[in-house]
Design a protein with these regions (language model features):
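H-loop/switch region of ABC-family ATPase nucleotide-binding domains
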Residues: 209-210
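A short, surface-exposed alpha-helical micro-motif characterized by mixed small hydrophobic
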Residues: 215-217
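A short, proline-enriched helix->beta-strand linker immediately N-terminal to the Walker B motif
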Residues: 167-171
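The feature captures the beta-strand-to-loop junction immediately N-terminal to the Walker
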Residues: 37-39
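Conserved ABC transporter NBD signature motif
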Residues: 60-72
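Conserved ABC ATPase signature
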Residues: 148-152, 156
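ABC ATPase "signature
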Residues: 230-234
Length: 259
């Protein structure tokens, strides 16, 4: 597997015995951004959640392997997966409400996240969080720390979600449609912040999107999914400039301009 951090090898995922993803293989290297692109229902988010064992009771990896730093994720007990989540693999959800309690302060939630992986004082947690806010360009860190998510905009909550996911400096970040609930301006801001994570921390990012334009702006490699199978996979420049799949060409035609 060489330098690869995350390797999906001929993966099949079923829900209640029915395949949602079939025979999908790809890998993610340190510092790389890999975008998984496809329409709703193609299996993108399912692939992402499988990397941290969040398929729910009905979901199961029924064939293949998902290797992360020498460990096969489908074989790991829940206790081991809990150690990996956050500290080694972080995740940004499509809806910030999925990861933030609306009535507890951002500071209390960030402190709790840090304490789940080791003892830390509230003062130390605040210092670490404010330093991260500053690196990510979030102005007014003190105010954000004291706010409850319902007092912040959707765009700011998404940015807080990015900060939460990076608290423990994981080597891999999973991002599930991080721009889909944002307007165009905030969507561009989220893209820039994700690119900054790689620049500042060397984070490898596995990003799910239905928007080929977002993939064009970010990806080193692209995996195109259609009905749970890989329609195309390769370097972003190659997939964008000379797509082999008709489905990939259709997705590209839906993007007004990649300039």
């Amino acid at each position: 597997m060489g330098e690869e951090l995350l390797v999906y090898d001929s993966v099949e995922i079923c829900f209640n015995g029915r395949p949602a993803v079939r025979d999908v293989s790809f890998s993610l290297s340190p510092g790389e951004i890999l975008c998984i692109v496809g329409e709703s229902g193609s299996g993108k988010s399912t692939l992402l959640r499988a990397a941290i064992g969040l398929l729910g009771r009905a979901g199961m990896v029924t064939r293949g392997d998902i290797w992360f730093q020498g460990e096969n994720i489908p074989d790991l007990p829940e206790r081991r997966l809990q150690k990996i989540r956050g500290s080694r693999i972080g995740m940004i959800f499509q809806d910030p409400a999925a990861s933030l309690c609306p009535v507890r302060t951002v500071g209390s939630q960030m402190t709790e996240s840090l304490r789940a992986h080791g003892p830390i004082s509230r003062k130390e947690a605040k210092e670490r969080s404010l330093a991260l806010f500053d690196k990510l360009g979030l102005k007014g860190g003190e105010r954000i720390w004291e706010c409850r998510p319902f007092e912040l905009s959707g765009g700011m909550n998404q940015r807080v979600g990015i900060a939460m996911a990076m608290l423990l400096n994981p080597c891999v970040l999973l991002a599930d449609e991080p721009t889909s609930a944002l307007d165009a301006v905030m969507g561009r801001q989220a893209v820039l912040e994700l690119l900054a994570l790689r620049e500042h921390f060397g984070t490898a990012i596995l990003l799910v999107t239905h928007d080929m334009g977002t993939a064009a702006a970010m990806a080193d490699r692209i995996l195109v999914l259609k009905d749970g199978t890989a329609a195309e996979y390769g370097p972003a420049g190659q997939v964008l400039a000379a797509p082999k799949s008709r489905y990939t060409r259709e997705l590209l035609e839906a993007v007004p301009s990649l300039e």
